[in-house]
Design a protein with these regions (language model features):
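Phosphate/nucleotide-donor binding subsite
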Residues: 67-116
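A glycine- and small/hydrophobic-rich beta-loop-beta segment
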Residues: 267-344
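A C-terminal functional module that forms or caps the active site or interfaces directly
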Residues: 350, 354-356, 360-393
Length: 427
């Protein structure tokens, strides 16, 4: 079955292996294909074992089966309800890989449940990276995940998603060992080995958990809110609302027991509606509403859409007011039309809410750009938004207005008090 002295063990309908060795050794799942990368795989195993790591090699090879892995291609196919001959007979790399991804994820979690993984290391090109990171993304935050990949220097969102995956650029093609790749692969192995040695499975906290989205332009408010809530013994997680940040917040809502959410920055919705760079997609904030998590919405950072360089901003959003944030990003001032689109969208989302929702609107400005010291200040817009959002929610949720700026202590205090009210009602 393999060359590492492990006894066979039946798990469900799939014959896996009983992994021997000192129980105190951290266990790392190594995902690598022996049919195309035998030399690199052996090198990574040696690097890990040299650090006192017990390696469990999962081999999702499709072309042919090579002896040596604890988890063979046949086991992976069987876990997906088929066999390797049927997988190969598909004669389509995408369809074949989908089967192997299903089996690999199932077996990885069975191994973790039985053995207790302390990390995952993988190496691959586009196909290997797609499969390995699908396994990594199925594991919770905190478990070390390192992907050595030829895809690491490009567009990595499809691979990383909202997870804590470390992408290591392979530099060269994964085609043998040379003076560069030896160092790169060893560094990747040592990285996951170090993390695995220090890994501790998370313990469930008894503290209330509040999630909050913000940008630098509403950071003053978020800092005041976070500090006040932490003084009350509440755990606060803050997310940067640049698209992936809000989507990560949504994912954590799905996976954890969240007490309340403060949506202090709705720029991801504004960008979704108007083609900005930081879109959170059509489902942003839907998770908390459908789950019934108490939620506070603030039109923070809705005074602008995030565009690219100033030339692009002029071309895409002509006739607007602009603030050059840096060479790569321009804030484009929103007006009544854009705010109306946001109010309509938010009203539709809130219509799906299964728990309490409150809206807080600061009448003196929505961000540091929308302030007397900023470049996009417009006091006429907050009252317009109040009318729009009040009409959109049609009395279903309260709309609170405060004649202060978003980045003031008074506004932060109001948000804190609302969160505490939610918590006390649940208790």
């Amino acid at each position: 079955m393999n060359n590492h002295g492990n006894a066979d063990k039946n798990w469900g309908n799939v014959q896996l292996v009983e992994f021997s060795g000192a129980s105190e050794k951290p266990k790392v799942l190594l995902i690598a294909t022996l049919d195309t990368k035998p030399t690199e795989t052996a090198y990574l195993r040696d690097c890990l074992e040299g650090q006192g790591i017990q390696v469990i090699h999962l081999d999702p090879s499709i072309r042919r089966t090579v002896a040596g892995a604890e988890i063979t291609p046949d086991m992976i196919a069987a876990a997906a309800g088929t066999n390797m001959q049927a997988v190969r007979d598909l004669r389509h790399e995408g369809k074949s890989q989908a089967v192997m991804m299903e089996g690999a994820q199932k077996l990885a979690h069975e191994i973790d449940a039985r053995e207790g993984l302390s990390g995952i290391l993988a190496i691959g090109g586009s196909m290997g990276t797609t499969l390995a990171t699908s396994v990594m993304r199925s594991f919770p935050y905190g478990l070390p995940k390192v992907m050595i990949s030829t895809m690491a220097s490009g567009f990595t969102t499809p691979f990383v998603g909202t997870r804590d995956i470390v992408m290591v650029n392979a530099v060269c093609d994964i085609a043998g060992l040379n003076t560069i790749t030896r160092d790169v692969y060893r560094n990747g192995a040592l990285a996951v080995a170090g993390m695995a040695k220090g890994y501790r499975r998370p313990e469930k906290s008894a503290r209330p958990l509040v999630l909050m989205g913000t940008l630098g332009t509403t950071e003053r408010c978020s800092v005041m809110v976070r500090s006040a809530l932490e003084r009350e013994g509440i755990e606060v997680m803050v997310f940067h609302t640049t698209g992936s940040g809000g989507q990560t917040l949504d994912q954590i809502v799905r996976e954890r027991d969240v007490t309340a959410v403060i949506e202090l920055s709705l720029v991801e919705m504004m960008d979704f509606l108007h083609g900005g760079l930081c879109s959170g997609g059509p489902d942003r904030a839907r998770a908390e509403l459908q789950k019934g998590v108490p939620t506070i919405f603030v039109p923070g950072n809705c005074d602008f859409v995030i565009a690219g360089p100033i030339e692009d901003a002029h071309a895409r959003f002509p006739g607007k007011r602009y603030h050059i944030h840096n060479a790569a990003l321009t804030a484009v001032r929103t007006e009544a039309v854009e705010l109306g689109h946001l109010a309509k969208h938010l009203g539709e989302l809130i219509g799906e809410a299964k728990g309490p929702v409150s809206i807080y609107v600061p009448l003196q400005g929505f961000s540091s750009h929308d302030s007397p010291e900023g470049h996009l200040h417009d006091l006429s817009m907050p009252p317009v938004f109040v009318k729009q959002i009040t009409a959109a929610v049609a009395g279903r949720v309260p709309v609170h207005t405060l004649d202060v700026h978003v980045n003031t202590q008074a506004f932060a205090d109001a948000l804190v008090q609302q969160v505490l009210t939610y918590i006390h009602k649940e208790a």
